């Protein structure tokens, strides 16, 4: 599973659940800070938690599910242009709104929703994400035009 040179960007609140999941992946990743801004210069997959579950109808109102730091990050046109896919964390207690932030980002940014996991994820989630990312980046690379084909 070669994912070297492929970028992960994630946000984790003070609970650190998403951070712990990303650490278990063992893949270099850039963290969106709680305060301040960053800019990413290469294609990436975003991993984010879902906020506010259980308080709105997901079919009607997407407000509050995506952390404000992620919204600010994606409102930067440069960062948004590099986004290739999204993975979301959530809590199954919120039913249909489980990992709903991933649905919001996928829809608004027109990128694939690659995976969802609960809280800090399980060992099976870690293995599935590592394998899935390797396959995803391989597919992305296959669809890049080479200089010879231009």
Swiss-Prot record:
Gene Ontology process terms (BP): protein modification process
Gene3D superfamilies from the UniProt entry: 3.40.50.360
Molecular function terms from GO: FMN binding
A Pfam family per the record: Flavodoxin_NdrI
Family annotation (InterPro entries): Flavoprotein-like_sf, RNR_Ib_NrdI_bac, RNR_NrdI
Protein function: Probably involved in ribonucleotide reductase function.
Similarity section: Belongs to the NrdI family.
Protein name: Protein NrdI
Organism of origin: Mycobacterium tuberculosis (strain ATCC 25618 / H37Rv)
């Amino acid at each position: 599973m070669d994912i070297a040179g492929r970028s992960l960007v994630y946000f984790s609140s003070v609970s650190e659940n998403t951070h712990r999941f990303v650490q278990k992946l063992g893949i270099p990743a850039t963290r969106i800070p709680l305060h301040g801004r960053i800019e990413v210069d290469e294609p990436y997959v975003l991993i984010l938690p879902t906020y506010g579950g259980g308080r709105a109808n997901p079919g009607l109102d997407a407000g509050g599910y995506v952390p404000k730091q992620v919204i600010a990050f994606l409102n930067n046109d440069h960062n948004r242009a590099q986004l290739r896919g999204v993975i979301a964390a959530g809590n199954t207690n919120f039913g249909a709104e489980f990992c709903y932030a991933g649905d919001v980002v996928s829809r608004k940014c027109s990128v694939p929703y690659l995976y969802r996991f609960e809280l800090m994820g399980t060992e099976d989630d870690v293995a599935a994400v590592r394998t899935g990312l390797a396959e995803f980046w391989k597919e992305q690379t296959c669809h890049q035009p080479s200089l010879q084909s231009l």
